[in-house]
Amino acid sequence: VIHQVTAENKPFLDICLGMQLHFEGSDESQGVEGLHVLDGQILRIPDQSGLKIPHIGWNSLHLQNDGRLFAGLEENPYVYFVHSYYLKAADEQIVKATTQYSTTIHASVESGNTFACQFHPEKSGTVGLSILKNFAKLQGGNA
């Protein structure tokens, strides 16, 4: 179904593990293929003194490349994360937001009408609600 929806260029939003499944594979499940919808690898967040893994909590986003999900948001909005693995996208142009947690994390990507967020917009207060409204508008909704 995911391949069909993305092939038809219908707006599609993946969150957290859903984002990770869109790529080639993951350190979390070595030898298990991802869906290959987008190019990139899912890597374990590097251990760094003073940082806990899993990464649970609020981090600011660095917005880039004019992501449609982030239209109308202030610079460096805070969103909520819960993860131990992160995306390293093969194509930097699809990366629409990054955050820092031991390394640069590709926190959101957009390719055509496929959107994905490592963070949880549904747990990210008014910023998350704005992101979800922007996605609804892409589907013709009156968010």
Locate predicted features.
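Cysteine-nucleophile active-site neighborhood
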Residues: 1-56
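Amide-donor transfer/coupling interface in amidating biosynthetic enzymes
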Residues: 4-7, 41-143
